[in-house]
A protein has these predicted regions:
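Enzymes that bind and transform nitrogen-containing heteroaromatic metabolites
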Residues: 1-174
């Protein structure tokens, strides 16, 4: 999501009243949504949409009032996912309640993917394998989990498909 957010600093507000830690719904009837997990409020959105998808930012209660005011001024919806850490199960309930979202396409990196896997919130895994090998050390994996991980998940193959360029598409039920 970072390529869609600016590098500008969040403007300081003139008003010093505390903004309540309540979800802000700028738009609830969009065709589709782009959801960003940003616990500390670092993403400075250029607009409230990414390629036509309304932006929803998931934040923690520790973000600044200046950041909340910034999101509101941009028309970016935000949901609180917890005090300091994000409770992904809670966030999914809120996404369904406020936006009618029942299914997600998770396009995260290893940390986001690992967090959803550790919370047992992934039901299907879709993997594209490109015929490229770089041999890099320290490359992120598909699932990176910092916290104590749970048991390994057994996957059941749903389908295999060969695509253009010798790419293979694997789909698994988790």
């Amino acid at each position: 999501m970072e390529p869609y957010a600016g590098k500008a600093k969040v403007p300081r507000r003139k008003a010093k009243l505390r903004i309540p830690r309540e979800d802000f719904i700028a738009e609830s009837d969009a065709e589709s949504y782009a959801i960003a997990i940003d616990p500390s409020g670092k993403l400075t959105w250029k607009s409230n949409a990414i390629e036509g998808e309304h932006v929803i930012t998931v934040i923690s209660e520790r973000v600044s009032d200046d950041y909340l005011a910034f999101l509101q001024s941009k028309g970016v919806s935000y949901l609180f996912g917890g005090r300091a850490d994000i409770d992904l199960s809670k966030v999914l309930v809120k996404l369904r309640k406020h936006f009618g979202i029942r299914k997600l396409l998770l396009e995260g990196g290893g940390r986001i993917n690992g967090s959803f896997l550790a919370a047992d919130l992934i039901d299907e895994l879709s993997v594209l394998i490109a015929p490229v090998a770089d041999g890099s050390i320290g490359t992120p994996t598909l699932f990176d989990v910092e916290a104590q991980r749970g048991p390994a998940r057994n996957l059941r193959l749903i389908s295999v498909q060969k695509l253009k360029g010798d790419v293979v598409w694997l789909r698994y039920k988790i």
